[in-house]
Design a protein with these regions (language model features):
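Surface-exposed, polar/charged faces of alpha-helical domains
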Residues: 103-106, 216, 262
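Solvent-exposed coil/turn segments that connect beta secondary-structure elements
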Residues: 203-206
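Alpha-helical segment that forms one wall of the substrate-binding/catalytic cleft
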Residues: 174-189, 195, 208, 221, ...
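Generic anion/oxyanion-binding catalytic loop in active/binding sites
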Residues: 21, 218, 236
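Surface-exposed patches in mature extracellular/periplasmic domains of secreted proteins
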Residues: 127-131, 191-199, 212, 256-267, ...
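Glycine- and aromatic-rich loop/turn segments at beta-sheet edges
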Residues: 211-217
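Cell-wall glycan-active module
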Residues: 1-185, 271, 279-317
Length: 317
């Protein structure tokens, strides 16, 4: 979340980022809430059946049941494999398909979601990592490892499990080519490499899927505080194009691209946050097709009963 540069340092970490951080690698039962904004103590209103409901997933057991790796069924929610060998086969298929230009939506989005869950499984069972990564091509192995390390950095922001679901509305992400066009337009105008903007977009709102319903805090796909938006934004704070250009404008004012570390730290005053952004950016810099996977990552949220998937159309009532 970018801060108003002229107001001096503000060491708070984005409430949204902290909550997303804990489910950066979905699949584990994780514990977190905002360090800056305590989780509300009131219970959330039950979700009407007329809108998509949150899907609960529990943490895997210490000894999951081995599973075969069936052919993808794109009509069902993806599920990560339950043993190292099957996960290696599954992730090899996922990573190859994500890099195949002939694969498009809706299959592409489904595969990105499965990639997210597979990475979560590796986070849950780190002893599988050598087996799984060993089955991947070297370039792909580096991309997967970079994503796993980024997830570890974001989990450093974790805290207690929230007591209620967030004041969010979940919307569909804009198409890949459209968002890539926005990042590259911002890069051409402000000199900020596109993959840093994509990393912020991923970490802050899962490529614009999260719409905060509170007018008091950070808003929009790139999570601007209203005062900061007044200085660096133009147009609609909830518009991907306008928000991405504003983020590039802010980073430029904060020292980018000459000093990306400094500029990213100005965006959100957490070194773990900066480390994660750099790691995701390096994945996309070295392998631009990596964005195709990240674009499919979904919104998960931690609860007392496990992580829940907040699907497109979900809104807190």
């Amino acid at each position: 979340m970018p801060r108003q540069l002229s107001f001096g340092l503000d060491t708070r970490v984005s409430a949204l980022v902290v909550r997303l951080a804990c489910v950066a690698l979905a699949g584990a039962l994780v514990a977190c809430s905002s360090a800056a904004v305590p989780a509300p103590s009131v219970r959330f209103t039950p979700i009407p059946t007329a809108v998509p409901t949150a899907t609960t997933t529990t943490a895997p057991s210490d000894s999951p049941t081995p599973s075969a790796t069936p052919a993808p069924n794109y009509t069902e929610l993806p599920a990560a494999a339950n043993d190292a060998a099957a996960l290696a086969t599954q992730l090899s298929m996922v990573e190859a398909a994500l890099r195949d230009p002939k694969v498009t939506d809706p299959e592409l989005g489904w595969l990105g979601h499965l990639q997210q869950l597979d990475y979560g499984r590796l986070q849950d069972f780190p002893e599988w990592k050598e087996t799984v990564l060993g089955a991947l091509p070297e370039k792909t192995r580096a991309a997967v490892n970079g994503s796993l390390e980024a997830g570890k950095q974001l989990r450093l922001l974790s805290g207690p499990v929230p007591k209620s679901l967030p004041d969010w509305k979940i919307v569909a992400a804009a198409p890949i080519d459209e968002l890539l066009g926005f990042y590259k337009e911002a890069e051409a105008e402000f000199g900020i490499p596109w993959y840093y903007l994509a990393s912020i977009h991923l970490v802050e709102t899962r490529m614009g899927r999260i719409r905060g319903l509170s007018s008091a805090g950070a808003q929009g796909p790139m999570q601007f505080m209203p005062a900061t938006w007044a200085s660096y934004g133009t147009g609609d704070i909830n518009n991907d194009h306008d928000s991405i250009l504003a983020a590039a404008r802010y980073l430029k004012a904060a020292g980018a691209p000459d000093n990306m570390q400094k500029a990213l730290f100005a965006y959100n005053h957490s070194q773990a946050y900066v480390n994660a952004l750099v790691l995701y950016a390096e994945v996309m810099k070295n392998d631009p097709a990596g964005y195709r996977g990240y674009h499919g990552w979904q919104v998960y949220y931690p609860t007392q009963d496990g992580s829940v998937l907040l699907p497109v159309g979900w809104i807190k009532e």
